[in-house]
């Protein structure tokens, strides 16, 4: 299985202008089978960026608050039970008559979404609703900054009144492909984009890479040993200095989410991004934690146990290839 976002494909085929159904039919006919697609903005209507101007307690409900919210062309009153909002927060607001994709509990999404209408909560009028990630139809596990419960807080520099769905990168379509083993070139977005360019007879534009480096030799810092050339023909390493961990840019997080990869931080996200883009697996290691400053590629021992990132201890066998440092599997 391979997923790509249409916007990511268009980054390399800028003149591509097709509907999701046209894309699906044409790509499948030319041999790149599309199993289906998902429109990320399905049932998301009239949702804008709002800024909370004031908050006061509800006179008749301890768990409700009354917010005055600037939504661009007007100020509206919204009653909410969200525990995590503050004055000055920018939030997604669905206006009267708009739609959200689901409920706040993250359960199955209703086919036609949920219509939002102005009404009264315990006697106080409310003219819209502030949205959680669940209500936007998204999996909060792919939004590292999303609260476990409550409203999703947008970046401080978000423009009040602008399209919140566009801001979150949800005006997009994600396609799922069935890639056969003889087309490993299509296990990356660039391979899919190349196929799309050929299918629709459009210009294919490779991303520009500005390689930077210096005269230092990687071998002065790190050694790589491949002990099994049958399973691993080549292993390459580079050393990157002066790293500062931080969140990756919003555009990168949006593309990763669209293809089913959870954003973590700038370093992990860059390696996952390149993997999704080129189909080339990558991994970043902390140099200071790499015993002997060495990478050893070898088969696992029969019955060897290894705890993976999900916290599960797995029993390995000799047909599994492992990456180790000088002392242990990493």
Please give the residue ranges for each predicted region.
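Conserved mixed alpha/beta core segments that line enzyme active sites in large multi-domain catalysts
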Residues: 51-79, 271-330
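Duplex nucleic acid-engaging cores and interfaces of nucleic-acid transaction enzymes
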Residues: 49, 91, 232-293
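Short acidic, glycine/serine/threonine-rich loops at helix termini
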Residues: 62-65, 102-114, 141-144, 189-190, ...
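Short, hydrophobic/aliphatic alpha-helical segments
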Residues: 174, 251-260, 316-329
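Phosphate-backbone binding interfaces of nucleic-acid-interacting proteins
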Residues: 2-216, 330
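Residues forming anionic-ligand binding surfaces in small-molecule and nucleic-acid pockets
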Residues: 160-179, 219-258
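Aspartic protease
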Residues: 87, 117-136, 216-224, 231, ...
């Amino acid at each position: 299985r391979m997923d790509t976002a249409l916007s990511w494909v268009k980054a390399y085929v800028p003149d591509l202008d097709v509907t999701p159904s046209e894309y699906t039919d044409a790509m499948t006919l030319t041999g790149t089978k599309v199993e289906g697609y998902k429109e990320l903005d399905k049932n998301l209507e009239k949702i804008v960026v709002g800024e909370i101007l004031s908050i006061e307690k509800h006179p008749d409900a301890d768990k409700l608050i009354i917010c005055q919210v600037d939504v661009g062309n007007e100020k509206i009153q919204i009653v909410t039970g969200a525990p995590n909002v503050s004055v000055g927060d920018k939030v997604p607001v669905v206006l009267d008559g708009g739609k959200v994709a689901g409920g706040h509990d993250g359960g199955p999404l209703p086919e036609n979404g949920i219509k939002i209408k102005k009404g009264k909560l315990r006697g106080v009028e409310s003219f819209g609703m502030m949205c959680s990630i669940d209500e936007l139809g998204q999996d909060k596990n792919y939004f590292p900054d999303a609260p476990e419960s409550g409203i999703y807080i947008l970046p401080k520099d978000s423009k009040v009144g602008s399209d919140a769905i566009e801001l979150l990168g949800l005006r997009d379509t994600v396609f799922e492909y069935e890639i056969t083993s003889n087309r490993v070139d299509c296990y990356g977005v660039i391979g899919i984009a190349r196929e799309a360019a050929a299918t629709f007879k459009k210009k294919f534009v490779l991303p520009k890479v500005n390689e930077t480096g210096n005269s230092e030799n990687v071998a002065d810092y790190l050694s790589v040993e491949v002990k099994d050339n049958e399973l691993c023909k080549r292993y390459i390493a580079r050393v990157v200095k002066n790293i500062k961990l931080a969140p990756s840019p919003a555009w990168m997080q949006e593309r990763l989410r669209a293809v089913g990869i959870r954003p973590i931080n700038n370093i992990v996200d860059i390696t996952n991004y390149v993997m999704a883009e080129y189909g080339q697996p990558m991994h970043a290691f902390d140099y200071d934690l790499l015993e002997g400053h060495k990478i050893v590629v070898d088969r696992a021992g029969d019955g060897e146990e290894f705890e993976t990132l999900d916290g599960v201890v797995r029993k390995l066998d000799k047909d599994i290839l492992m990456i180790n440092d000088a002392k242990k599997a990493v």
